[in-house]
Amino acid sequence: MTGNLVTKNSLTPDVRNGIDFKIADLSLADFGRKELRIAEHEMPGLMSLRREYAEVQPLKGARISGSLHMTVQTAVLIETLTALGAEVRWASCNIFSTQDHAAAAVVVGPHGTPDEPKGVPVFAWKGETLEEYWWAAEQMLTWPDPDKPANMILDDGGDATMLVLRGMQYEKAGVVPPAEEDDPAEWKVFLNLLRTRFETDKDKWTKIAESVKGVTEETTTGVLRLYQFAAAGDLAFPAINVNDSVTKSKFDNKYGTRHSLIDGINRGTDALIGGKKVLICGYGDVGKGCAEAMKGQGARVSVTEIDPINALQAMMEGFDVVTVEEAIGDADIVVTATGNKDIIMLEHIKAMKDHAILGNIGHFDNEIDMAGLERSGATRVNVKPQVDLWTFGDTGRSIIVLSEGRLLNLGNATGHPSFVMSNSFANQTIAQIELWTKNDEYDNEVYRLPKHLDEKVARIHVEALGGHLTKLTKEQAEYLGVDVEGPYKPDHYRY
């Protein structure tokens, strides 16, 4: 380290004032702290939880390893967890999503300086390689005292959970399987990390798995992984599916996306959206936010869907429902939002208009066939960070690809705004408290937060926006068969 600038050429943690970390530049901490203070005013859910729980310290003793986009909003979450008594180590869950000033602010802490940081260990910087990303994930899960490993995981996308559970699985098998030639590049890096670690430590991940009391998962893709682990009998600790809390999925996924998709495309391309033909792949909560955002800009929007219910919803909102093959040749902008893989393949990319824009807002980079594009012989010119112009020599057509097929709203912009993330992160904090303080009540299965906690999060934010809720009379509550104070809807209610 030279001055405050952290070099990442050597993958070893930096240590200052007893804190190990690896970030871009500690001198950015003051800028990060200023933005963090503004964000706190826009995150009433987290600030309310600080006021409610600061004295009782419900997370005292919790050692939380967190894998979630290292943004300003996440910085407020991290400092909420520590304010409630937890110790925390952090890494980002995406190679492009870190806001370097936010990472610096968290390491330095509210009472430290770059020369004497007093914050939280963070291992994240914008523009990591895959090798750096998985190295950082391991550092986040590796606590200084081997006798006091992580005992809670806070995850987004399931990478931290997968690292622990797959690592334990391979340790018990006595071997890390070899990568196949056609495996994705990231899977090869993942297996190599586990293989290298197994050579020096035969039970690292097993010890961590046995210590972990639970995991709380932020996003749709990570929840899918959790259910797959549970179905296979491989889930070694309880999990709370935060994503399917109503105040997460119906707000973060839809309204957050509605804001940040446009921001990412504007910052990445400066292209006018109005009047353009836009194809949104997927019409779940995220896809709905995308389609609504594009419609609001005056675009002509079409949607692809596998589910007839979602497809009918799209048509009732005025969107054409088409197949990729039908629409790809006419689309000016294509956005994938399915949570699935192999949505836009090389043959689709080759059929796109000259200078059409292609991006993804699903969690992983496998919705767009980036590997096929890289093998195609197309030439790549980097226009600016996370904006690439790919040109096919046989046709002369060029395609603008955002964030290398990864989350464009975080790679090209700054992600979802603070207020909507306050909903999601309030749920995360409550879920961490729930699993930590009531661990005996949970088996190694996937759970959702109870309805009354969902309503609690919503109530905080309604009041913050100046709304006034109507209060049921006792007679009205009896008529509906609910309590005066709620919950007001059954679990099967679809908001």
Swiss-Prot record:
Its main location: cytoplasm. PANTHER family: ADENOSYLHOMOCYSTEINASE. Homotetramer. Binds 1 NAD(+) per subunit. NCBIfam families: ahcY, PRK05476.2-3. It is an enzyme of class 3 (hydrolase). Its cofactor is NAD(+). It is found in: Cytoplasm. Belongs to the adenosylhomocysteinase family. It comes from Mycobacterium tuberculosis (strain ATCC 25618 / H37Rv). One of its GO terms (molecular function) is adenosylhomocysteinase activity. Its EC number is 3.13.2.1. This is Adenosylhomocysteinase. It catalyses: S-adenosyl-L-homocysteine + H2O = L-homocysteine + adenosine. GO terms for cellular component: cytosol; extracellular region; peptidoglycan-based cell wall; plasma membrane.
